[in-house]
Design a protein with these regions (language model features):
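Acidic-glycine-rich active-site phosphate/pyrophosphate-binding loop
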Residues: 115-130, 211-222, 364
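Fold-level recognition of mixed alpha/beta catalytic cores in primary-metabolism enzymes, strongest
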Residues: 132-135, 140-255, 406-422
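Acidic/His- and Gly-rich active-site-bordering loop/insert found
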Residues: 2-135, 159, 163-164, 401
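Metal-dependent amide/peptide-bond hydrolase catalytic core
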Residues: 1-10, 14-17, 34, 59, ...
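Short Gly/Pro-enriched turn/cap motifs at secondary-structure boundaries
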Residues: 81-86, 206-210, 268-269, 375-377
Length: 436
């Protein structure tokens, strides 16, 4: 693949000339603490970051809007109850085209995972540091570098007096790293386009599909007693160790995982089978007290073909309840004290055609710059799924660095970031068209 015109050559050169600005904007974004929230956390620098982006886009002539969503207090499967967006605005901006072209959504999330263990970083994670051709810092690849690349692509087109025929919708959201609620709120607000790109660090591949997640906390009842005293049978009032009883539940998860690996309905051309992974265990109150309860939280990943008719993961939940209940059915204790399931965080998977015109356009633009990617899947989840399910076919496409996402010394190569920004600029020209 090659550049197709003198205009495209000028656009690529304009992005490359803006390398220092791209690194500088990435540094500004990394310096703002937008660590993904835990329940009850106060706002951090989310509003400052969104205002910074809005100002850059307004300078290009974009109509911008920042808003703090107000979800219902009770929440639902997709937005946690009581989630407060005060101080955590979403940003939408529209660069209107001249008319007659296809519109595009450029999406990114501004939250980043925490920096612990901070003392293991080579440098301050909130100070972007260049080392051996790489930029180190929290969010360097996931995904403040990608967001900066989107902005620089738009600025490069503006400097070359390129007006697109189709509209560009730019949207940055919060809460991708936690509940996915920011993307949900953007969709509810009406954000959308003919198709879209989310700037995740894909190493120039196109993540056109992903797995989704449901999260159960399963509580096992026991009966407290003195751990150092012999106990009667539980039917006679003896203590029951909830931690020991939990073992059968964990074994049931392992058996279900192996079954899913072997089942034909868990085969997907781009994704691993569904999975169930215990991630948190809480039980016991004192070292010499037999625990009266124990709970395990699990991360359950499911495939696009397992989304039910209502667009949820309830069918997966029902299967897990049935199978884990069966796993403990031979124990009379569980007949009288059944497992208790509490569910949260249904982030729903999605997929779009690997040969969608925007996918082939973006991959072709990257190939013209020497970056050859292909359609692929993400075994985790991303905001692109939310926009896809809402009617804007969206895939993730971005620079290198995913192998260090969420890790100490997260990094992205300078060359990769520049080429990503140039690929986006080319994609805008080819997808949206240029005003005559």
């Amino acid at each position: 693949m090659r550049l197709q015109s003198a205009l495209e050559e000028r656009v690529v050169e304009a992005v490359r000339d803006a390398k220092d600005e791209l690194v500088g904007l990435t540094a500004e974004l990394v310096a703002l603490d937008t660590t993904a929230r835990l329940p009850g956390d106060p706002p951090r620098d989310e509003e400052r970051l969104q205002r910074l982006l809005a100002a850059r886009l307004e300078a290009l002539g974009a109509d911008t809007e920042m808003w703090e969503p107000e979800p219902t207090g009770d929440g639902d499967r997709f937005v946690p109850a009581g989630l407060d967006f005060s101080g955590r605005p979403q940003l939408a901006a529209v660069l209107p085209g001249s008319g007659g072209g296809r519109s595009i959504l450029l999406n990114g999330h501004i939250d980043a995972v925490d920096v612990e263990p901070r003392d293991q970083w080579l440098s301050d994670p909130f100070v972007l540091t260049e080392r051996d051709g790489y930029l180190l810092g929290r969010g360097a690849n996931d995904m403040k570098g990608g967001v900066a690349g989107l902005v620089i692509a738009l600025e490069a087109l503006h400097r070359q007096d390129v007006r697109l025929a189709g509209d560009v919708v730019f949207c940055t959201v919060t809460d991708e790293e936690s509940s996915g609620a920011g993307g949900r709120m953007a969709v509810a607000h009406g954000v959308g386009a003919d198709a879209g790109i989310a700037a995740e660090p894909t190493d120039f591949h196109a993540w056109v599909s992903c797995r989704g997640t449901v999260t159960p906390t399963i509580t096992v009842a026991g009966r407290a007693g003195h751990a150092e005293m012999p106990q009667r049978d539980w039917r006679e009032g003896g203590a029951v160790n909830a931690i020991e009883k939990l073992v059968a539940v964990i074994d049931g998860m392992s058996a279900l995982r192996e079954e899913w690996k072997a089942r034909s309905d868990h085969v997907h051309p781009l994704l691993a089978p569904g999975d169930i992974v215990p991630t948190i265990v809480n039980g016991g109150t004192w070292m010499v007290t037999i625990p009266a309860s124990c709970a395990v939280t699990a991360d359950i990943m499911y495939l696009p073909q397992h989304v039910d008719a209502e667009g949820t993961g309830r069918a997966v939940e029902a299967e897990v309840i049935e199978r884990l209940t069966a796993a403990v059915a031979d124990d009379p204790w569980f007949v009288e004290h059944p497992l208790q399931f509490a569910w949260s965080d249904d982030v729903v998977p999605a997929e779009m055609p690997a040969d969608h015109p925007l996918v082939t356009t973006a991959l072709g633009c990257a190939a013209a710059l020497g970056r050859r990617g292909q359609p692929a899947g993400l075994n985790s989840w991303h905001d692109a799924a939310t926009f896809t399910r809402a009617g804007t076919p969206t895939f993730s496409f971005g620079p290198d660095g995913f192998d260090t996402a969420h890790a100490v010394d997260e990094r992205v190569s300078v060359a990769g970031l520049v080429d990503f920004s140039a690929a986006v600029a080319l994609t805008l020209v080819r997808w949206c068209g240029v005003a005559s």
